[in-house]
C-alpha cells in the first residue's frame, strides 16, 4: 500500500498543477467575457440589452481554430466511408460513439449493441442491450461489424464491466466468432511499441500483438492516427490504429 499511497500523492499534485493552469485560463476567459459584455451593452439599444439572469457565458470557445478531437474525427469518418462503400445488408456496431452510429443508421440498416441502455430512441437505429463478451448472435452470422475504440477498455472496470485481465482478447475473439465468412470487421485501438495497461482507462498494444489477435483474418486496410495526422505509416510510439479485417472463407 505504500507504493499506492505515494502514487496518489504524486497524482494529486499533478491534478492540482493542472487545475491551477485551468484556473488561470478561466480568469482570463472571464475577463474577456465581461469586456465583451460591456462592449455589447454600448452597441445595443436599451430595449435590446441582455438581462443578467439570461447571461450564458461560453468560456474558452473564442479560439483561433475550431476545436476538434482528432481520434473520433478521423476514425469515425474512416469507418463510415468504408461501411457505406461496402453497403452491407445489415451492420452491427458494438459500443462505438453514439454520433457515429446514429449517422451511419441513416444510410445503412444498423443494430447498436451496448452494455448500457440507449437513453434516446432513433427511428433508423435498432438497439440491442448486450455485452461484447457474450454477443446475442450465432456463430458466423453477421456480414459487417464495427467496434471503434472499445476493446481496449474491456475488463478494466471503467464502464462498470467486470474486471478481466484478458478482456480485450476475449472481446476480439467474440467479434471474430459472430462474423460470417467473408464478413468485414472495423476496429480501432490505441497502439504503442509494447503492450501497456493504463488501468481503469484503457490498454495499448504493439502492432504485432494486436494483429496476432485478429489472425487468421485478412487485414484489408490499416490506418493510423498520430496526433492531428491520419496516415498509412505506423511510425513509432503512441497512435491509434484503425483496422479493416475480413474473415476468410
Regions found by a protein language model. Name each.
Residues 146, 151, 155:
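A conserved beta-strand element that flanks and buttresses the S-adenosyl-L-methionine
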Residues 163-184:
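A short glycine-rich, Lys/Arg-flanked "PGG" loop and its adjoining helix->strand segment in the class I
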Amino acid at each position: 500500500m505504500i507504493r499506492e499511497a505515494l502514487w496518489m500523492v504524486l497524482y494529486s499534485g499533478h491534478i492540482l498543477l493542472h487545475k491551477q493552469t485551468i484556473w488561470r485560463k478561466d480568469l482570463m476567459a472571464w475577463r474577456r467575457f465581461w469586456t465583451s459584455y460591456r462592449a455589447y451593452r454600448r452597441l445595443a439599444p436599451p430595449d435590446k440589452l441582455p438581462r443578467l439572469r439570461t447571461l450564458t457565458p461560453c468560456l474558452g470557445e473564442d479560439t483561433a481554430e475550431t476545436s476538434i478531437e482528432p481520434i473520433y474525427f478521423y476514425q469515425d469518418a474512416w469507418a463510415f466511408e468504408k461501411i457505406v462503400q461496402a453497403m452491407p445488408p445489415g451492420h452491427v456496431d458494438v459500443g462505438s460513439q453514439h454520433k457515429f452510429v446514429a449517422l451511419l443508421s441513416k444510410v445503412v440498416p444498423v443494430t447498436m449493441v451496448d452494455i448500457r441502455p440507449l437513453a434516446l430512441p432513433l427511428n433508423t437505429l435498432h438497439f440491442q442491450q448486450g455485452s461484447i463478451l457474450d454477443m446475442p448472435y450465432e456463430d458466423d452470422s453477421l456480414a459487417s461489424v464495427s467496434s471503434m475504440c472499445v476493446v481496449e477498455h474491456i475488463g478494466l472496470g471503467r464502464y462498470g464491466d467486470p474486471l478481466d485481465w484478458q478482456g480485450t482478447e476475449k472481446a476480439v475473439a467474440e467479434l471474430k466468432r459472430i462474423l460470417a465468412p467473408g464478413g468485414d470487421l472495423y476496429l480501432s485501438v490505441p497502439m504503442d511499441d509494447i503492450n501497456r495497461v493504463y488501468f481503469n482507462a484503457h490498454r495499448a498494444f504493439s502492432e504485432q500483438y494486436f494483429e496476432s489477435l485478429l489472425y487468421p483474418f485478412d487485414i484489408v486496410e490499416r490506418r493510423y492516427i498520430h496526433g492531428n495526422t491520419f496516415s498509412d505509416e505506423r511510425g513509432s510510439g503512441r497512435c491509434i490504429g484503425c483496422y479493416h479485417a475480413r474473415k476468410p472463407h
